[in-house]
């Protein structure tokens, strides 16, 4: 088996599996009940943390609770957990979701919103390539409430590939997985405006 990495728009990942255009999705996808109806998933290989990305010159850099975003405009990536969790903020102005993080970052840098939601590895990559941005984590019990575990998706019924991937994942310790994710963040392409 040979590995070939291809870039797909988020909304085309599951259709790509179903149409045999791609064999597996390794893209920070959570195995939701809805998705499980369309594709099969490995056990989770990583659990992330939800954060918000803000401009460094914003007073939001010091918040510790998602409710501190009340009255602010917050945006997330279209058709992802990171858009739906915004509704956990009481009184938030839930901005229109965007297709990708470069668009969200551009919007944030140009004052189109006050914050964008992301998982920690994505936020680290964005902040590393955008010196005017930072990310905010929340105090224990004061962040978003959502399943942030991610799994690998394969075409529904492709048990042979699913079993091979699961066996490979099972051979990697939790510490090794965390280290692999840290290295992946360092290698990801810059997300600039």
What are these regions (language model features)?
Residues 4-15, 61, 96-110, 121:
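Short helix-initiation/N-cap motifs at beta->coil->alpha
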Residues 17-18, 69, 108-109, 165:
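Hydrophobic residues within well-ordered alpha-helices
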Residues 1-28, 37:
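Extracytoplasmic small-molecule ligand-binding "clamshell" domains
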Residues 81-98, 134-140, 166-193:
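Ligand-binding clefts/hinges and TM-proximal coupling segments of bilobed small-molecule sensing domains
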């Amino acid at each position: 088996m040979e590995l070939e990495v291809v870039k797909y728009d988020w909304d085309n990942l599951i259709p790509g599996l179903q149409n045999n255009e791609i064999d597996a999705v390794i893209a920070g996808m959570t195995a939701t009940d809805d998705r499980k109806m369309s594709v099969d998933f490995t056990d989770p290989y990583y659990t992330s943390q939800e954060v918000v990305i803000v401009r460094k010159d914003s007073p939001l850099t010091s918040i510790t609770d998602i409710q501190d975003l009340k009255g602010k405009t917050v945006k997330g990536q279209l058709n992802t957990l990171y858009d739906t969790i915004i509704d956990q903020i009481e009184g938030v102005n839930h901005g229109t979701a965007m297709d990708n993080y470069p668009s969200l970052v551009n919007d944030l840098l140009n004052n189109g919103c006050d914050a964008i939601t992301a998982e920690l590895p994505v936020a680290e990559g964005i902040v590393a390539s955008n010196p005017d941005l930072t990310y905010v984590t929340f105090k224990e019990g004061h962040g978003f409430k959502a399943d942030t575990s991610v799994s690998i998706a394969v075409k529904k019924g492709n048990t042979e590939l699913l079993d091979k991937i699961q066996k490979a994942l099972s051979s990697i310790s939790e510490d090794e997985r965390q280290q692999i994710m840290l290295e992946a963040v360092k290698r990801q392409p810059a997300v600039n405006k």
